[in-house]
Regions:
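Extended, compositionally simple fibrous regions characteristic of intermediate-filament-like scaffolds
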Residues: 88, 168-177, 270-273, 293
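Long, compositionally biased intrinsically disordered terminal regions
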Residues: 222-223, 235-237, 244-309
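Short N-terminal or domain-adjacent regulatory/targeting segments
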Residues: 1-33, 173-190, 287-309
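Internal, hydrophobic cores of structured domains that mediate oligomerization or house catalytic pockets
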Residues: 93-187
Length: 309
């Protein structure tokens, strides 16, 4: 059955999916799509539509072969179903692959033959991620492994701590990506005001993996204790740096516009909008090497967990 440019394959296999990619490119008149990577998305059925839409938007900056993988019930006979095609706003190729039965335990055997040759592989878990992404059979196929502790259906703080403890080069979390703009503003503030910071605080919703990472990053950079305060949100609402000359602060109450305050200078507005997942995903796909600052931050956060010295 064909819907637009998407072809549905029932009880199929990797070879048939790969052949359908070739046919889809031919129908589109684009034998070479100029794709730069493979993006694998491991997603539950109820998150699949939103995750694939986010990847579609990100594909305009990073043309890719996008493989959505839905791991279904692992009981019973193995079955692979897929929707394959191009177009529909995609800058590349896409397949949404549903696995059932025994093959769920060996999803990498379906995905591996579909990876673009001689190109990087990124994998994204939009909801619950494995405790150790680099050791996961699908995660082991990728150079970049993207999780999102804030989107987990389990405890968000625990999920972030678990990702910190199992960090491996190539891992990242969208909780970190969400604070890129905060970190840039704070770094700029410290450049403008070359004074010693003697204390700091980060205010955010009580459960906020991003705030925990930001507080840890600040403590690592400034070598001061950073107080983690609770607010009603949304997200991170304020960062304060204490200096002998006075406070340097960035306050954002509406999730869109912040106020930057510093000693002996008038307050000024700063754009600091909470970004959507497609923009966060696109940012992470720009770099496929190890993020050493993230690595240092998560190791420091992991070391602060109860039971660690």
């Amino acid at each position: 059955m064909t819907t637009g440019r998407m072809v549905e394959l029932i009880d199929t296999n990797s070879s048939e999916i790969a052949a359908e990619f070739v046919r889809a490119r031919t129908r589109a008149g684009s034998p070479a799509m100029g794709m730069v990577m493979t993006l694998v998305i491991v997603v539950p059925e109820d998150h699949a539509e939103a995750a694939m839409d986010a990847a579609r938007q990100a594909s305009h900056e990073h043309p890719a072969r996008v493989l959505g993988v839905i791991l279904g019930d692992g009981r019973g006979a193995a079955q692979v179903n897929a929707q394959v095609g191009t177009g529909h706003g995609w800058a590349g190729e896409t397949a949404l692959i549903r696995l059932k039965g025994e093959v769920v335990k060996h999803a990498e055997s379906v995905v591996l033959p579909l990876l673009l040759p001689d190109s990087p592989v990124a994998i994204w878990w939009p909801a619950d991620a494995p405790d150790d992404p680099a050791a996961d059979p699908l995660g082991a196929l990728a150079q970049r492994r993207i999780t999102d502790a804030a989107a987990t259906t389990r405890g968000k703080t625990k999920a972030m701590e678990t990702q910190c403890a199992s960090y491996a080069p190539g891992n990242t979390d969208l909780a970190w990506t969400r604070i890129t703009l905060w970190r840039a503003l704070l770094a700029s503030a410290l450049e403008q005001h070359r004074v010693k910071v003697i204390g700091a605080s980060v205010a955010a919703e009580r459960i906020s993996p991003s705030a925990d990472l930001l507080a840890t990053w600040l403590g690592d950079r400034l070598r001061v204790d950073v107080e983690r305060k609770n607010s009603s949100g949304p997200g991170i609402t304020e960062v304060v740096l204490e200096t002998k000359a006075g406070q340097i602060s960035i306050e954002r109450r509406d999730g869109k516009l912040a106020t930057f305050s510093s000693p002996e200078a008038p307050d000024r507005p700063v754009a600091l909008k909470r970004r959507d997942v497609p923009e966060l995903l696109a940012e992470e796909l720009r770099r496929l090497d190890e993020d050493e600052i993230y690595a240092s931050t998560v190791r420091r956060l992991a070391a602060r967990r109860p039971g660690n010295s």
